[in-house]
Design a protein with these regions (language model features):
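Gram-negative bacterial Sec-dependent N-terminal signal peptides
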Residues: 1-21
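Mature extracellular/passenger domains of Gram-negative fimbrial/pilin and adhesin proteins
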Residues: 20-239
Length: 239
């Protein structure tokens, strides 16, 4: 047996210079599946500031809330990723555990006294518009994984449920039924709600409690009031 193998090997060596070498094409495949790295407005964690400016304490009504209906505070949020992905997010309220006597539903993100953040002094809401994926028109849709309270609008930000950039407008659907769009650049304009509610999805607008309600919390407006609020959007790649 060994002699036979040796003979074949020698024959192959002797014959090699005589045979024409066949061309070879190597069809190689390279790929990489891993979570993408994304930035929000150019940073891994970005603070998007909505500045309502300064108003006089005299504008706050004695027994009714003060509504910021005359201003338009808005910002563009851009999420850029280094690989194609689906993108969803969930909104939470940093000061959501503070007590608020009015408009205490899912769309309201609490505003608190900066010097005493245990005291809620009002609330803000947000709506979005002009959603895009890779520069093409898209929608932001809401899943029904978390029940919302208050009126249901298509483009209002609520605390709890999953949202995602989709190819069609969807509301209150199973999270696995969201028609998510894959892309690398996700963008939307966020602004505070409009004081005049309508069927297009505008909500009631940012507000400050009345002087009477603030007084119950030990807040004297004659000394001025600095307030803060924070809606946190936590992004995820898919549902």
């Amino acid at each position: 047996m060994k002699k036979v193998l040796l003979s074949l090997t020698m024959l192959a060596i002797i014959s090699t210079p005589v045979l024409a070498k066949s061309p070879v094409a190597n069809l190689k495949i390279n790929g990489d599946i891993k979570p993408p790295t994304c930035t929000i407005n150019g940073a891994t964690q970005s603070d998007v500031l909505f500045d309502y400016g300064r108003i006089s304490p005299s504008l706050i009504p004695q027994s009714k809330i003060y509504s910021y209906s005359g201003i338009v505070a808005h910002n563009v949020v851009t999420v850029e990723c280094d690989a194609k992905t689906y993108l969803t997010f969930v909104a939470s309220d940093t000061y959501g555990d503070t007590k608020l006597s009015v408009n205490n539903t899912s769309e309201w993100f609490h505003l608190v006294d900066k010097s005493n953040p245990e005291n809620a002094v009002g609330a803000a809401d947000f709506i979005w518009s002009d959603a895009t994926v890779d520069g093409k028109p898209a929608f932001i849709s809401r899943a029904n994984d978390v029940a919302i309270t208050g009126k249901a609008y298509k483009n209002v930000l609520y605390k709890g449920p999953i949202y995602g950039w989709t190819s069609e407008q969807q509301s209150d659907v199973d999270k696995n039924a969201l028609a998510l769009i894959s892309g690398q650049v996700f963008q939307s304009n966020f602004k505070h709600g409009n004081a005049n509610s309508n069927s297009n999805g505008n909500s009631n607008g940012t507000f400050i409690l009345s002087k009477d309600e603030l007084s119950k919390k030990g807040i004297d407006l004659s000394n001025g009031l600095d307030f803060i609020g924070e809606a946190v959007l936590t992004f995820n790649f898919g549902v």
